[in-house]
Amino acid sequence: AGKYRKRDLNRLFVDSEQEIVEAVSLFAVITRKRIPSREISFRTQIPGSYDMKYDKIKVSDDAYVYGLLDCIGELQAVISRSKRQNDLDFANKVFGIMGELFNEVETLTEFSNTLKKIKPKMDVAAGTLNNARKLLG
């Protein structure tokens, strides 16, 4: 019974973890830092204190992959904004990162039987990548 309870708990956390991956990855790109692995470090306030401490969360494979795919969608908005601000250099760098992310996710999911909704999300990400390419001309 313990194994099934853990699987149900994982299903509950996947959406939250996915949002964390998307946000942390987007922030990393915008601040020109490295996109984190499944183990994400962050700072948090110690309860009952003003002091901060570093902590980590390790997200599931599913959450990581879906979060990266969602990040690709957000990066198109970054490209659009950068282009409007005439920062074509950054827009092109972000486009390169989008392509790398897509290729990485494609490699991670090529032989996966567990990622149920991956095909539609991959199609959306491919379309987003294509739209960003057109945007950059």
Model-inferred region functions:
Residues 4-15, 56-64, 83-90, 110-117:
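Non-transmembrane, amphipathic alpha-helical segments
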Residues 1-51:
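Long, charged all-alpha helical bundle/coiled-coil segments in cytosolic proteins
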Residues 34-43, 72, 77-78, 82, ...:
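Generic detector of ordered, mature protein regions
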